[in-house]
Amino acid sequence: MLYSFMCMQRPLSFGSLRKIISEHFLNLPDYRDTDKVDYSLHDVLMSGFAMMFFQDRSLLQFQRRLEDEIQQNNLRTLFNVEAIPKDTQMRDVTDEVEPSVLEPLFDNFFRLLQRGKHLESYRIRGDYYLITIDASGYFGSQKICCDGCLKKESKNGVVRYEHQILQAALMKPGMKQVIPLAPEEIRNTDGHKKQDCEINAGKRLLKKIRSSHFKLKIIINGDSLYSKQPFIVELKLGGMSYILVAKPGDHKILMEWIGEQRQLNEVSRLEIKDQKNRLHIFEWINNIPLNGNEDTPWVNYFEYWLQHDGKTTYSNPI
């Protein structure tokens, strides 16, 4: 008798995910004087989650949505919110919640996806997973600032204060859905005179990812900011592979080496013409020095061009 065994995906319902978030918020310690609050920390945070779920562009738009009685009932039933806070209270309360207390939620979701076999469709090159990292800003002002703000001064002397995060997400080409991991704040901290930066946040994020997912075979994907020796060394220490953009202006020695190898016909090349008469050009070479340092990492280089009517319409060196 023959048997065929299949790994069946276990469905994840919105209700089960919402329950996990709600329970986590209920267990968070409230930093406020509970005798003087009108809205529980749970209701404030769940309302914030609802705003993101409905994809409202602002707190004001979210509040306008809740002017409708049906929408209020949806918030209470779908998100288990008893008392709906006003926008100013939502802002004041959430601003004081440390992001670190929310990070376990990301790990919990990830493990649910693992147990339900949902991550298997994200595998690339056998059993690797591609994690893309990129920074984004979520607050900026020329007047309002705090001790954690990043300070940026323009050429004309205008000072701008910002808050940024470095976000990591598991993704795969062709898949519309991405799976976010816990982000890392880019912010100034007490006791450090030097301003925080994206690359330092990136190093912290790598350690966080490896600590949470120590068995996962990972490929980190990032822009040209990360294709420098200190970050690549950190990747290797974490046992991670990488695909990083390498701009010619940032890697003069690397480009000189590639140019010399190209003259010696040591660079592999493949050209493919598609049905639209566009020419796809691929070039690659393995095991070349990243820079001129004695302890330089040795890397692989790949470049792609798209040409149409003899003109390059797209290129990307990695």
Please tell me what each predicted stretch does:
Residues 153-217:
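Electropositive, glycine- and tryptophan-enriched low-complexity nucleic-acid-binding patches
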Residues 192-253:
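Domain-level cores of phosphate- or acyl-group-handling catalytic modules
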Residues 247-318:
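An anionic, glycine-rich sequence signature occurring as long contiguous blocks
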